[in-house]
Amino acid sequence: SLFSSALLDNNKFVAMTGMMRSAYRGHDWAKALESAEHVLHDTRSDSKIKAEADYIKAKSYLATSRRAEAFKVLAELSKDVSGPYGAEAAYMVIQDSYDRGAFEEVETKVYAFADAGSDQVYWLAKSFIVLGDSFAEREEFEQAKATFESVRDGYEPSGPDDDVIDDVTMRLKKMESIISQQEQN
């Protein structure tokens, strides 16, 4: 393998991180987990590489139905939302709270994410959409609508594949329909 044939320590480290990424992208979850552990325990790993390794570990756990282990890693990773891995982890933890019906928890976590001052606006916007959904689930339709409008008015899409505005537009139409029906009754 590339790792065993590398002679210099730095080349071994590059090979190890490459093997982790390759296993993850190739959906070889067991190898991705094993490689991520090696990267996490290597003294040459900086905080960015460790965050990536934790992310790969969590996503690999999810892919192999090891949900509890995944969310333990995601909860830890979500403590630093300054980078893309921590921000996505925060969103996933928020979505999990929503899925469990823990709507007050959703609210607390979204506001904590916002207060952290992260520049990861995509994941923050997705988190606010989940917050709006949690208001709708509690039949707080005006609050849900205001949350979705806030995302719509304050979010700048990052490119043509960005789904935030489409998600918000669909939800706003639904809220307007529900509110209109309530006013008629």
Q: Which stretches of residues belong to each language-model region?
A:
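Acidic, polar-rich low-complexity tracts and alpha-helical solenoid repeat scaffolds
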Residues: 1-185
